[in-house]
Design a protein with these regions (language model features):
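Bacterial N-terminal signal peptides that target proteins for export
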Residues: 1-10
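Hydrophobic ligand-binding cavity/cleft-lining segments
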Residues: 17-67
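Glycine-rich portal/gate segments that line the openings of hydrophobic small-molecule binding cavities
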Residues: 37, 54-57, 64-107, 158-163
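A short, structured loop/turn motif at beta-sheet edges
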Residues: 39-43, 88-92, 111-121, 163
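Solvent-exposed, polar/charged alpha-helical surfaces in well-ordered, non-transmembrane soluble domains
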Residues: 43, 47, 53, 147-150, ...
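Beta-strand/loop substructures that line and gate deep hydrophobic ligand-binding cavities in soluble
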Residues: 101-151, 158
Length: 163
């Protein structure tokens, strides 16, 4: 079972908790999964993109580690001076992060999996609660996020394949 799938299942396994610890009403959860084939071995591809603030380059914005150690569980990053995310899980070739804003309870996983000894695949999974987004804006929001992360994967792929 993929790391992102396991985390999503754990999130849905019981009532979500707010920062105060009280039960939250059921949400409207969405998962967006993007994949990209990479012409590089998995370990080499991961080595090129594993930095927790590398996302700043992929999104063409700023990113800074504001707490903890880069790449370690518990590290907190701030993207574009406003979005704060914490690493909640990691493996040798992946990490999962969560937004600390409980409004949409989003988390994402970036992972690389081997396909052959010389090729691999990036998988970027975003999972979030769209209940706080007005119903008439949800489809456009999902489309915007999917396009943004498709661009992120294209940038990651280029970095991983660069000599």
């Amino acid at each position: 079972m993929k790391l992102a799938t396991m985390i999503a299942a754990a999130t849905l396994g019981g009532a979500a908790l707010t920062s105060a610890g009280s039960a939250k009403a059921a949400g409207d959860y969405v998962s967006i999964v993007q994949e990209a084939a990479v012409n590089a071995p998995a370990a080499q591809a991961w080595d090129k993109v594993k930095g927790y603030c590398a996302i700043g380059a992929w999104l063409k914005t700023t990113c800074e580690i504001t707490a903890g150690k880069d790449g370690e569980v518990g590290a907190l990053r701030k993207i574009a001076g406003r979005v704060e995310e914490v690493i909640v899980a990691k493996t040798a070739t992946s990490y999962t992060y969560a937004d600390i804003n409980p409004a949409i309870l989003y988390h994402g996983t970036i992972e690389v999996v081997p396909v052959t000894p010389k090729t691999s695949k990036f998988i970027y999974t975003l999972f979030f609660d769209q209940a706080s987004i007005p119903a008439e804006q949800r489809e456009a929001n999902r489309t915007r996020r999917a396009a943004m992360f498709a661009n992120v994967l294209a940038t990651m792929k280029a970095a991983a394949e660069a000599k």
